[in-house]
Amino acid sequence: MAAVTIKVKMESTAGTGYYKTTTKNPRNHPEKMELMMYDPKVRKHVLFKEKKVK
């Protein structure tokens, strides 16, 4: 059986252009992810929203 995980880009909402890549299983989590993560450009924890990897 093939893997169903997809790569997603988590982009900072602080407007710095900083992003991280991660994977998710769309069968378990079909909605877009939103996580609080550290943005080193602003030196704070900010909200990261899921974007599509190109």
UniProtKB/Swiss-Prot annotation:
Gene3D superfamilies (UniProt xref): Ribosomal protein L33 (2.20.28.120)
An annotated GO BP: translation
Ribosomal protein as UniProt keyword: yes
Pfam families, A to Z: Ribosomal_L33
InterPro entries tied to this protein: Ribosomal_bL33 (IPR001705), Ribosomal_bL33_sf (IPR038584), Ribosomal_zn-bd (IPR011332)
PANTHER family: 54S RIBOSOMAL PROTEIN L39, MITOCHONDRIAL, LARGE RIBOSOMAL SUBUNIT PROTEIN BL33M
Name of this protein: Large ribosomal subunit protein bL33
Source lineage: Bacteria, Pseudomonadati, Pseudomonadota, Gammaproteobacteria, Legionellales
Gene name linked to the record: rpmG
